[in-house]
Amino acid sequence: MNRSLLYPRATTTRRLIGLDGMWRFSFDPESKGVEAGWALDLPSSLSMPVPASFCDLFTDKASREYCGDFWYETSFFVPAEWSGWDIVLRFGSVTHRARVFVNGVEVAQHEGGFLPFDATVTNIVRYNQFNKLSVLANNELSETMLPAGTTRTLADGRKIAAPYFDFYNYSGIHRPVWLMALPKERVLDYSTRYRLTETGAEIDYTVSTNGTHPVTVELYDGTTRVAESSGTTGTLVVKNAKLWNVHAAYLYDLVIRIHEGSAVVDEYLDRIGIRTFEIRHGRFLLNGSPVYLRGFGRHEDADIRGRGLDLPTVKRDFELMKWIGANCFRTSHYPYAEEIYQMADEEGFLIIDEVPAVGFMQSTANFLAANQGNGRQQGFFEKETTPALLKNHKAALTDMIDRDKNHPSVIAWSLLNEPQCTSAGTEEYFKPLFELARRLDPQKRPRTYTVLMTSLPDTSKGQRFADFVSLNRYYGWYVLGGAGLADAEASFRHEMDGWAKVLHGRPLIFTEYGTDNLSGAHKLPSVMWSAEYQNEYLEMTHAVFDHYDFVQGELVWNFADFQTTEGILRVDGNKKGIFTRQRQPKDAAYLFRKRWTTLPVDFKKRKK
């Protein structure tokens, strides 16, 4: 099996053609396209950009809210000189499931909307000709998928997504599509692990190929080769190594080659950063030095393009994070586009990488009622659907770690977001996931999950599996919001005293906290939704953080305003952003800039 999640790279042995652009598009509400032959000829003149969400490009509500099957179609040319190579199609993501056809022949199926997949089409394509590429996608939600939800049918027969999660169900081909020509024998994967020494660093590596020819691995600093080794496993010894660090990223070029005599059979290039990350004595240590995490929970979300990869927006986001003094973000609530991790590698940002395990709670109202403990709930992990959910969860976790394990920016894995984890089935569900993450990751990064408001120190059955505890807390907003801010602080401190008793030396971070603020809304005295109230809430919350030595990070919710399912609790989306959806600062941004640019990197380091 030649499955590989390596990022597409053009080298002396590999060729790439990008297929992004305007494709043809059609909804298929009756799911008749396959039988009607749409894989060979899509009966539509509608165009659609790739990558992008289709939702916000339309002006009618039925199209924006469409739920069900939908099709994309384009054509691609295969050069004659590619004959003799393996021809592979690679999709960065299709939300939430896809069937891929080439010249009418089905070549791939994939479940999961946030990770890449590929299809080998060597024996299907016609060389020196144009070939038809069709994608049948589907965006329905269920309790066996990540993220979780349901799909309802309206009175007129239309389907509508009913998510258990608080972000919009953007759908489409969201990330780049590549046509690749690869050598028959090639590099499929590699992994690295780092050790710092008195004279530099050592990099233990493992390379996976689909053949038996010898492998060499070289490390370059610019044009200078600084280390080399041979074999599919080995160690690169780097003297006077330049370490990758926060806002001081240093990247080396890794070159992996397969040889047959004097010929190079395959060559794969990547950029890596030498760094270590661990938890010791209740502190996060980057290259052996304490680092206090500060930054955001985020979303891949922007005007018009929805969740589609947009590099100008990515660039703006990183510039804003640098301006405000952040050093970390969580990929809430799903793995992001690979290009975002590459920029984090280059800019020196830390990432808590999150699998799309969100919506793992059920309420007769919505996510908010579940978060407050209102509405009728049941144990989410004691259902008939649980075995299928766990299988899909393991598959997504495996692909995320396989894809992202070599990024120096990735420092931890988040295995779930706000699951209902006080019921009897929690431990049976959690245990194999945490064991799998530890087994798959050669660097043994710390593992966590974000803890729901109703999961307290004495009721959460999942927290014992986490290497560090991650809390989502909204004292002063969802709990005791408004005039009772002093009471909210007292309740907050009471809960924190409880966590102090169960951490057993582990650090604790906040992966969510915040209030909604309508940009430009001012009120004296303050009221909820105003800029003044948002700042008062943040000052109170930060005072609590600073009081507890075991708090080792703060990731505010959210980086920017983002779209959600419409409802009476959301004014055209979630407004907890420190920046507007258009990436302009709210008043609170200046509060964070003052705090984060003055906090030392090793804030709360262990006092000797």
What is each PLM-predicted segment?
Residues 1-343, 347-351, 396, 411-412, ...:
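Secreted/periplasmic carbohydrate-active enzymes, especially glycoside hydrolases
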Residues 204-206, 318-320, 328-595, 604-605:
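Substrate-binding/catalytic cleft of secreted carbohydrate-active enzymes
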